[in-house]
Curated annotation (Swiss-Prot):
The family this protein is said to belong to: Belongs to the thiolase-like superfamily. FabH family.
A cellular component annotation (GO) from this entry: cytoplasm
Organism: Streptococcus pyogenes serotype M6 (strain ATCC BAA-946 / MGAS10394)
GO BP annotation list: fatty acid biosynthetic process
UniProt-recorded name of the protein: Beta-ketoacyl-[acyl-carrier-protein] synthase III
Length: 324
């Protein structure tokens, strides 16, 4: 049988740094108010780089690190809710920029679960035997979706990209997965709604910026995500002691605190970087993974079991346990 493995990781963030104190100068907030509620102190904001620019930086790094030729890449999946345009896809721009002429490329929209969903799909593509090498990138410029007068949401989000190179392997590395969607709760977190504008339409007011029911999302993350992780471990006969690190979507420090208690895993196993990047949606998990590899916490030698878990708009949530 053929399986997939993560062979390379990379990330990139824009240079512009915006601190909580910077935000306090343009809206009614403070560093203390933001940090005490979220664990976020600063975030990176793009000045002129589009989502594709961030993703291209990651793709270039992955190619350089791997030593592969661009035409050896079979597919590119970009998980994003902030594409450059609805057409062409962000992934198509990445494919062109790195000259991966043999690769098919497409975007996936699953909000903050996007990277996990895309990685699960990429694993199946390689397991089919038809493809050998693929890139999965989470990339966001959420700053263009934020209402900068709304302190409830503007303080949360940042821009960035992270990704992995997947290669075919004889050994199984994706050990377990669970993916979920509950569209009935979709109005809890929305952004980028468009208006009907044909000569025949009655019309509908667009909701361009991010709008969130914070309490509903907080409760959803603690209840549904914790339950799905516990079910996943039980079904796969993987215990909490088998897990070396937990890399969850970087939305809020208090969410991580509560999930750690719910699933009874030591809090120190939960890596985090939201303090420096904020919530980067589909990019948060791969950025966290890339930094953990840089720091030597995760070795990419196939000896560690890592829980990856995303949750967000849709509502969507999903987890993978991977041997890395």
């Amino acid at each position: 049988m053929i399986f997939s493995k993560i062979s390379q990781v990379a990330h990139y963030v824009p240079q512009q740094l915006v601190t909580n104190n910077d935000l306090a100068s343009i809206m009614d907030t403070s560093h203390e108010w933001i940090f005490s509620r979220t664990g976020i102190a600063e975030r990176h904001i793009s000045r002129d780089e589009m989502t594709s620019d961030l993703a291209i930086q990651v793709a270039d790094q992955l190619l350089t690190q791997s030593g592969l030729k661009a035409n050896a890449i079979d597919f590119i999946i970009v998980a994003t809710i902030s594409p450059d345009a609805t057409m062409p896809s962000t992934a198509a721009k990445v494919q062109a920029a790195i000259a991966a002429t043999s690769a098919f490329a497409f975007d996936m929209t699953a909000a903050c679960s996007g990277f996990v969903f895309a990685l699960a799909m990429a694993d199946k593509l390689i397991a089919s035997g038809a493809y050998q090498n693929g890139m999965v990138i989470g990339a966001e410029t959420l700053s263009k979706l934020v209402n900068w007068q709304d302190r409830a949401t503007a303080v949360l989000f940042g821009d960035g990209a992270g990704g992995v190179l997947l290669e075919a392997s004889k050994d199984k590395h994706v050990l377990a997965e669970t993916l979920h969607t509950d569209g009935a709760r979709c109005q809890s977190l929305i952004s980028g709604e468009t208006s009907l504008s044909s000569p025949y339409s009655i019309g509908k007011k667009a909701i361009a910026t991010i709008q969130m029911d914070g309490r509903a999302i907080f409760d959803f993350a603690i209840r549904d995500v914790s339950k799905s992780i516990l079910t996943l471990m039980a079904q796969s006969d993987i215990t909490k002691d088998d897990i070396d690190y937990c890399l969850l979507h970087q939305a809020n420090r208090r969410i991580l605190d509560k999930i750690a208690r719910k699933i009874d895993v030591p809090r120190e196993k939960f890596l985090e970087n939201m303090m420096r990047y904020g919530n980067t949606s589909a990019a948060s998990i791969p950025i966290l993974l890339s930094e953990a590899v840089q720091k030597g916490q995760i070795r990419l030698d196939g000896t560690q079991k890592i829980l990856l878990s995303g949750f967000g708009g849709g509502l969507t949530w999903g987890s993978l346990i991977v041997k890395i």
